Each structure stands twice: as C-alpha cells, then as structure tokens.
C-alpha cells in the first residue's frame, strides 16, 4: 500500500469514527460537529483518490461551518451526562487528527510534485483546524472538573 492509499484509508477510518460518535449523542451541536467532521474526512479521501487517479479536484475549506456549529453545543454538563466517556472520545479523536497531521507533514516533506505539495499543505491546515476543535472540546469538558478541584487557587478564565 502506498502513502496515498494509506492516507485515503486513514481519512475513511476517521469518517467512520465521527459518524459513530454522531450517532452516540443526542446533543444537536455535537451531532452536527461530528457529521461535519465526517463529511470533511470524506472530502479529503475524495481529493486524495482523485489525485491518485489523475482526476480533477477542488480544495475547499469548510472549517467555517464547524466554527458556526460549535456555538450550538449544549451545556457542557449535558455533554458529560450524554457521553460519559466524552473526554476519552475527544482525546482519541485528537490523537487521530495529530497522526493525520504528522503523516501529511511527512508526505509533504518527501514530495517534489507541486500538485501534491498543494494537497498536503491544504490537508495539513485542515487537520490543524480539526486538532484545535478537539482541543476546545477537551477543554470544555475538562474545565468543570478542574474548576471544582482548584477553585481555591484564584481567578479562572471565563468559558
């Protein structure tokens, strides 16, 4: 299996992961985020497949949709109730996104093809934005616990 095929499989695995998580929550905002991330992973796989087959493709940044959906997420306490292992899920998703980011960076470093460079640079930025989103979800779920555990130690950032 070559690196492009590996990348396609990784994107499709991520799509499956996000669809499973979308089905496991009742929170509309989280469901929307997971569905949007699944669609983005599907788009990434299509871009890579088109490039591998020398077909045309378009690099479209859809991260703005996720930022808008993020505002729809319900109360963080509800998220913890609905998905007891939410922190584990987000940490796993973050690790997966980081692996993708590292893989695309390696592929970028190893290619001399201008078209491949553009694709990998695009995918690196996409994966970075996914990492940021997961970090925000981790912080949102973690902060209530941290706040209670360390409330005596002073002023906390608002969230």
Spans of features found by a protein language model:
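Iron-associated oxidoreductase/ferritin-like identity signal
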Residues: 1-159
């Amino acid at each position: 299996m070559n690196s492009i095929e590996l990348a396609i499989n990784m994107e499709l695995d991520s799509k499956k992961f996000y669809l499973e998580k979308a089905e496991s929550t009742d929170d509309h905002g989280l469901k929307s985020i997971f569905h949007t991330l699944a669609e983005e992973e599907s788009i990434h796989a299509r871009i890579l497949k088109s490039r591998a087959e020398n077909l045309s493709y378009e690099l479209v940044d859809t991260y703005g949709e996720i930022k808008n959906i993020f505002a729809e997420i319900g109360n963080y306490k509800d998220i913890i109730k609905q998905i007891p292992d939410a922190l584990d899920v987000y940490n796993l998703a973050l690790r997966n996104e980081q692996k993708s980011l590292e893989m695309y960076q390696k592929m970028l470093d190893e290619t001399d093809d201008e078209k491949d460079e553009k694709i990998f640079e695009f995918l690196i930025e996409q994966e970075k934005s996914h990492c940021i989103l997961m970090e925000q979800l981790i912080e949102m779920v973690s902060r209530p616990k941290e706040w209670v555990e360390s409330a005596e130690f002073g002023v906390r950032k608002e969230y």
